[in-house]
């Protein structure tokens, strides 16, 4: 999305990750998209930020070491958090569960998810917001550290550092219930796709296409001769 006219009147605005949080926030500010998002948020539209989008939603962005743009700037001020960019980069797989959320986000409370973090900077909390989730680093299926706070929720805005947050079936269903309730629709009115199942179906189609276009008997013969 590049123009204010493309925004329309959505039920949920999702600000995704970015490699340059401060630079992209300046761009949103210059072309009027930030003002439009803030206007819709004031009218009750849900706003969710992931990673860099989460950082944008906070009160301030500080870059003392010049990791991105240098200096400091005001955030969108929808979440009571501050972000300070640091040279060290966080890269880790995580799993967790959303906390006891409030207002329009209540239906996401207590939902399990998996994903990963990859970002610069640390975010700290001001009083007033709710911790969005508790997460732990994972290796395979094992937690390797204690659960820690991640993300924030305040009124109709929320944010998280976790990429892939809505890939799980549980989170997809919870978000669907939330949006249906907000619009006064029965859950049955909207269909959803299990992304993991969909991916497996596409892999099966690809494998079948390869089998049809290749001499599988010859391939198996070569494999057997190589193992002999």
Give the role of each language-model region.
Residues 26, 35, 48, 55, ...:
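Feature representing long, continuous alpha-helical segments
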